[in-house]
């Protein structure tokens, strides 16, 4: 139920809700990939962490290019995790 009376405003409300749900799903998926890398780092498994990191990079970069997150936020995630993986030895 929307408060809108104008047809175009009703349509925009529907589209906005649809987009909000899609974005929430994408954001959740991205966070899951990031958590997978953190889990591998915490376990001390360097090779598994590196492969999870490669997958995470693809997802984070895609979300940044689509505007779901800022490019700097994507860069921060990648550099922080890369440094932790490098530390594993």
UniProtKB/Swiss-Prot annotation:
The segment annotated Disordered runs over 1-29
**So which domain of life are we looking at?**
Bacteria
| Pfam families assigned | Ribosomal_S20p (PF01649)
Query: From which lineage does this chain's organism come?
Result: Bacteria, Pseudomonadati, Pseudomonadota, Gammaproteobacteria, Pasteurellales
Q: Does the keyword Ribonucleoprotein apply?
A: yes
Species whose genome carries this gene: Haemophilus influenzae (strain 86-028NP)
Q: Where are the transmembrane segments?
A: none
Report the protein name in the record.
Answer: Small ribosomal subunit protein bS20
Any one annotated GO CC term: cytosol
Query: Which residues does UniProt call coiled coil?
Result: none
Concerning InterPro entries, the annotation shows:
Ribosomal_bS20 (IPR002583), Ribosomal_bS20_sf (IPR036510)
Q: What start and end residues bound the annotated signal peptide?
A: none
Task: Please report which protein family the annotation says this sequence is part of.
Answer: Belongs to the bacterial ribosomal protein bS20 family.
The GO biological-process annotations, alphabetized, read as:
translation
> Which terms are listed as keywords in the entry?
Ribonucleoprotein, Ribosomal protein, RNA-binding, rRNA-binding
Q: Which GO terms describe its molecular function?
A: small ribosomal subunit rRNA binding; structural constituent of ribosome
Q: What does this protein do?
A: Binds directly to 16S ribosomal RNA.
């Amino acid at each position: 139920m929307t408060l809108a009376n104008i047809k175009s405003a009703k349509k925009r409300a529907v589209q906005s809700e649809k987009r909000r749900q899609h974005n929430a799903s994408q954001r959740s998926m991205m966070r899951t990939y990031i958590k997978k890398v953190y889990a591998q780092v915490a376990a001390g498994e360097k090779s598994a962490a590196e492969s999870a990191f490669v997958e995470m990079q693809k997802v984070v970069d895609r979300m940044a290019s689509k505007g779901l997150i800022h490019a700097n936020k994507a860069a921060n995630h990648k550099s922080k995790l890369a440094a932790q993986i490098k530390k594993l030895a």
